[in-house]
Design a protein with these regions (language model features):
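Sec-exported extracytoplasmic/periplasmic mature domains
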Residues: 58-59, 93-100, 130, 134
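Short acidic, glycine/serine/threonine-rich loops at helix termini
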Residues: 80-81, 119-122, 151-156, 265-267
Length: 322
């Protein structure tokens, strides 16, 4: 019989228990003459990423090879491309509630990450993980991501009066780009974009939402406002093509420092999976590439290790050096 106690398929809303899974396996083997087919299996993993990870963690040759399993197939966003953080929160809640029902401790594995946030533990998802990890006998393990060698992060320290530039290569056939700039609220930093044709667009860093237009591209900016739990401000920049694609070439993100008290800033692109193969920073920073929610305070962040070279994998997401 299966060691899977439950499957929750968020894409359909269906939930399966051990009895129904065992029954499916029995009927399927009877009809196929012993050859098992996964085509219509409950909560079938079409991507196979979750299956591969669970095999390492709890497969017959895995680490916890006798452990029971509660599996969640995550739902997707409206455009059906990437999971939503709310889906992940629902999945964690489901697993822990089931563990409470079975009166068993539980290790929750999350092999998911994104770049949206200040990477300081203060997003809703990170706070949720911190809180729910204290609610029961559980440990939450989160992969640190695969972004360290993908050139999706640029950051540093800027002092009063300095100008620093991030060079962003935009490949052909790039449909849209989201750029996040995070800085301390009390630092005054002006931002200017320069497109590959040399046109300069000064970004207004006051107000809320602003719109600009440059060659074949509409630019929408959203400025974050103070909150009780976050000392960082987001300057969100969305590049949207007027036709099919953004103007390819080197875009410059120019930071011009006014009054500076801290000076630390970070710029993130979306996950490399959401970008074209040639879209990346020319002068990236590998530190700070750990993905959210591995940045939560009460989780175990897990990197990737290369056993052949006895070192961490080049792609393994990294935290900050401070």
């Amino acid at each position: 019989t299966t060691r899977i106690l439950n499957i929750y398929d968020q894409t359909t809303g269906e939930k399966y228990d051990k009895q129904s899974i065992d029954e499916y396996i029995r009927l399927n083997e009877d009809l196929s003459g012993g050859t098992f087919s996964y085509d219509n299996a409950p909560g079938v993993d079409n991507i196979m990423h979750g299956t591969d990870v669970s095999y390492i963690a709890a497969g017959s040759l895995g680490v916890a090879y006798e452990a029971d399993i509660i599996a969640v197939k995550m739902g997707y966003s409206i455009n059906n491309q990437f999971p939503r953080t709310t889906s992940l929160m629902d999945a964690i809640d489901y697993i822990i509630r089931k563990a409470i029902e079975y009166r068993k401790p539980v290790a929750v594995n999350i092999s998911y990450g994104c770049n949206y946030g200040a990477h300081n533990g203060n997003t809703l998802l990170e706070s949720f993980i911190d809180d729910i990890s204290k609610s029961y006998r559980c440990v939450i393990c989160v992969g640190s991501g695969n972004e360290a060698d993908k050139a999706i992060h640029f950051g540093g320290i800027i002092n009063t009066g300095q100008v620093q530039t991030a060079y962003l290569s935009v490949g052909e056939y790039q449909s849209a780009i989201d750029i996040q700039i995070w800085k301390n609220y009390w630092d005054t930093i002006d931002v200017m974009l320069i497109n590959p044709r040399g046109e300069q667009i000064g970004i207004i860093t006051e107000g809320r939402i602003n719109r600009y237009e440059t060659y074949n591209t509409e630019i929408i900016t959203l400025l974050g406002e103070p909150s009780p739990y976050n000392i960082y401000q987001e300057i969100y920049i969305n590049l949207i093509p007027k036709t099919d694609y953004i103007l390819s070439g080197i875009w410059q993100i120019v930071l011009m420092a006014g009054s500076i008290r801290a000076g630390e800033y970070n710029i993130w692109l979306p996950s490399s999976q959401a970008l074209g193969y040639a879209t990346a920073f020319n002068n990236p920073t590998a530190d700070g590439t750990i993905t959210i929610p591995a940045t939560a305070r009460n989780c175990i962040a897990v990197g990737a290790y290369n056993a052949y070279t006895n070192s961490y994998a080049a792609f393994s997401g990294r935290g900050f050096d401070n």
